[in-house]
Amino acid sequence: GNDSGLANNGINISCKSGNWSYTNPSDIRYWPTTDTKLNFYAVNPGSNRFFSWKFSNSKKEISYVCFNEYQTSNFTIENGVNKPIHTNTDVMYAVAKDQTHETNKGKVKFKFKHILSQVVFKAKTQYDNDMEVDINAVSIHNFQIGGTFTIPEGEPAQSNWTLNGKNQPSGFTVKKVEEGKNIKVTLSDNAKDISDGPMLFVPQKLTKWAVPSTIAAANTAKQSYLKITCKIKQGGAFLFGSNTEYKDLYVPFEADWQPGKRYIYTLIFGGGYDADGNPILQPINFEAAVDDWKEEPESNVDL
């Protein structure tokens, strides 16, 4: 089946009061016999404007396109609170093969697996001095925004994705510009969160920007980087930007994202590059950590 139409050409199962049941009673299905083996496939959630699925006997596919959910234009004010209009979807799938009526007393048990990668960013300074970095905005550039995931026999892997070839040089927002919401990072701080929230990406490898080439050349070559709009101050004097101006600093970025993993990148500030690839102070370094994806509310992610 596929997800065309409200019926989804499949069976819609929903949870009410802690119990899973048929959303539409007319969709109820019965076991043919007590010992007939059946294979079951599930996708959660069913579908939306950013992803779809198509299952046949020979192939089971889920197509997904990422959305720049933290961009300023995606937010609206509701009851005095800035809320997103659209958000990315944590798409999961589950497979239960060779099930009979006797396997689990007539119930089909699913263990869902994530098909996307989750990414968050933190920042800290490098030097043992009074350097202060004032961050106004952050974005990530040059990655594939979507593709098709083929459900594998084993565990999900990056190789199960066929990317759609649509690169994103204009970038996705990590931290949007908000008045009074700039982030100040000093050596005395532990690494500070600089993401507006966890980001979801199609699993893929990113090739970092090859400095000293320009940002324009990086976009042509589809090389990845972070753009950080910030000020850098030491001893009361501005090394980058000014009291009244934030400036753009660029950082080469590489990644190897796998499905179902959460990646935590800590930017260690000591400098970076301008748009022409010229160094500003010293290059920013990275510390990276990866965790199995933990089911935590997006508004309260313990990193």
Spans of features found by a protein language model:
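Short aromatic-acidic-glycine turn motif
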Residues: 142-155
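Pro/Thr/Gly/Ala/Ser-biased low-complexity repeat segments characteristic
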Residues: 163-171
